[in-house]
Amino acid sequence: MKTKTHRTPTRSDRSIVQLVAHCACILAIVSITSRGVLEAADDQKQSELEASYFSPPIQVTQGLTKAGEGYFSPDSTRICYQGVPQGYPFYQIFTQPFDMQSPQPTSAQRISPGRGRTTCSYFSPDNQKLLFASSHLDPNMQQTEDAAINQAKEDAQSGRRRRYQWDFDPYSDIFAFDFDSKSLTRLTNAPGYDAECSFSADGKTIVFVSDRDGDPDIFLMNADGSGVRQLTNVPGYDGGPFFSPNGKWITFRSDRIEKDMLHIHVMRSDGEGDQALTDGKSVQWAPFWHPTKPWMIWTGADHSDPEKRPNYDLYLMRYSVDGDNFIPGPTIRMTDHPGADVLPVFSPDGNHLMWTASRSSDRVSQLWFSTINLDALELSLNRAAALSLPQQQ
């Protein structure tokens, strides 16, 4: 485990991190209508690039002010996600039935208690539990809610649209909801922010983020909340961790290379072998593993030109592993439409993709689903690899 100088991060330290820690760069927030699946806006139609990689995206959530950060259940019969209910200022956690053969919005069931900020839901591998982070035990909940509601009213009157920002809520803890007993078990109870949690493939270990040591770092704990151990200990934000399918690696995002410039990292599941996979004046975040292929997908945007608005798109990397060495390979861009495409996840069979976007005509952030063309992606990765080879003289 690496060491660092202890510090307490400030709001300015976290300006970009707060922007993208969960559902960043989502476009305008307006109430969704009661219509069926919304039509894609004219400027959001699928491009030639996108059409070569995946089927026309289908919106699979509606009825909430906005929704995002979705994940499939292990058997692909449900999805979980966070959404903002009508008339309430904070995200709550929902699940809904899902038909892979006929994807469409269905009736959502709220799983979280209904108050406070909630985020980062994730199914257990045995499909019996749902992890999520929640601040519903905030002792000042009424004041917290009132402040957010009053701010929303002021913004509505003035027409102001605030940049998306997620607070590192000091009352956020990790909970596990049991689908059979309908009980909620608290797994963390340390001062500060605990969130951004997911299971290992065997269901025995949870990887999560906590700022209990002064800034957000990555930790492990047993599935029952015991045996907490720290993996990263370097100044800056480390977050959004996920185990590889074989449990030997963890990918995450970090701004330790340069303040506010998030990049994709990978390390072994014991915290050793930490390395950055991306670099430069860009924000790269929300990495997620393909379940069967040596691929990793994430969201990225160029931030090198301060006069240019960054556009977040999806990128796919092929990697290889040689013993304890993780070797990044060619990377291709998968989306190129004008809005933000963020938080991509593969289905358990690896044939489908779900992500957060604002592709409907009303520009509300929702979850979208597509079937991916594995052969086309493999071919493009092969071409990218060939172009990166040294040219013979």
Name what the model sees in each region.
Residues 14, 25-27, 152-156:
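Residue-level detector of bioactive/disordered segments in secreted/extracellular proteins
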Residues 38-393:
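Sequence signature of WD/YWTD-type beta-propeller architectures
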Residues 5-7, 21, 369:
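Intrinsically disordered, low-complexity segments enriched in glycine/proline and serine/threonine
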Residues 20-35:
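Bacterial N-terminal signal peptides
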